[in-house]
Amino acid sequence: MTTNRKDEHILYALEQKSSYNSFDEVELIHSSLPLYNLDEIDLSTEFAGRKWDFPFYINAMTGGSNKGREINQKLAQVAETCGILFVTGSYSAALKNPTDDSFSVKSSHPNLLLGTNIGLDKPVELGLQTVEEMNPVLLQVHVNVMQELLMPEGERKFRSWQSHLADYSKQIPVPIVLKEVGFGMDAKTIERAYEFGVRTVDLSGRGGTSFAYIENRRSGQRDYLNQWGQSTMQALLNAQEWKDKVELLVSGGVRNPLDMIKCLVFGAKAVGLSRTVLELVETYTVEEVIGIVQGWKADLRLIMCSLNCATIADLQKVDYLLYGKLKEANDQMKKA
């Protein structure tokens, strides 16, 4: 069942097309008089207890099937060569099946910056086992209540999640990242997570892979919930009051370096890409994908140079305009 479900997730994630992307409603104000040389632009950032050379990473996607193994190996090769973080999909499948080697990428990619992922429905003992077996630099702990509710075989008991989060925050020996799965983390959840000791969250908003769409596609029901949740930029706007207390990572519908820059302008420490990279490794050779990802680094630098920003922190000083739904929602928040 798990193997089939994981492969269905890949299939439906690739076929899904979103009609709305919140990044298109943000316009950055260009600077006509440059201050820096291109070679002065610094892409480094810090989150989860360490410094990273680049402000983007390959986010959690898959594992638990032969197809997942193939994809994870490709993604690991891209990430290792490009010097970026790669986070595997949920390790739960391997916890259920010790012979599952679809997550075993470190042996063939020893210099890989590896993260892994587990659901908050799992008690901390399984989180500790995951860290012991995978030896990641960080552990994503995902919250996916709507996905679980839409899955016929999904979780129905959620009272333990908050106590689990407190346990993860206290007992996991590597930094943890509380991660949404495409529904947009709300500010109240960030506040509760902060109270439990969490200092890094991935907002993961609507606009990219929709697990509501995927589960409804699997079941043939409830397509009226396909657009559930807050868009990525809306979730980031909602989280502005927390950006000085909690490290905000952003994912969900990120397509290119300009989308990444827009996240960084609003205080993100780094940006995760899932479906965009999945489409690349399913379309091109690994060598070609590496070339594309290396090109993203160059593009980030040239966009930052045109905005008069030498560092990631400088981007928060960039002026911008909001349009459409984002502007309407932002105006409402200012009145509240």
UniProtKB/Swiss-Prot annotation:
It catalyses: isopentenyl diphosphate = dimethylallyl diphosphate. Keywords: Cytoplasm, Flavoprotein, FMN, Isomerase, Isoprene biosynthesis, Magnesium, Metal-binding, NADP. One of its GO terms (molecular function) is FMN binding. It comes from Streptococcus pneumoniae serotype 2 (strain D39 / NCTC 7466). Involved in the biosynthesis of isoprenoids. Catalyzes the 1,3-allylic rearrangement of the homoallylic substrate isopentenyl (IPP) to its allylic isomer, dimethylallyl diphosphate (DMAPP). It is found in: Cytoplasm. The keyword Cell inner membrane does not apply. This is Isopentenyl-diphosphate delta-isomerase. InterPro entries: Aldolase_TIM (IPR013785), FMN-dep_DH (IPR000262), IPdP_isomerase (IPR011179). Its cofactor is FMN; NADPH; Mg(2+). Mg(2+) binds at E148. GO terms for cellular component: cytoplasm. The gene is fni. Substrate binds at R5, K6, Q147. Homooctamer. Dimer of tetramers. It is an enzyme of class 5 (isomerase). Belongs to the IPP isomerase type 2 family. Its EC number is 5.3.3.2. Pfam families: FMN_dh. FMN binds at A60, M61, T62, S90, N117, K179, S204, T209, G253, V254, R255, S274, R275. Coiled coil: none annotated. Gene3D superfamilies: Aldolase class I (3.20.20.70). One of its GO terms (biological process) is isoprenoid biosynthetic process.
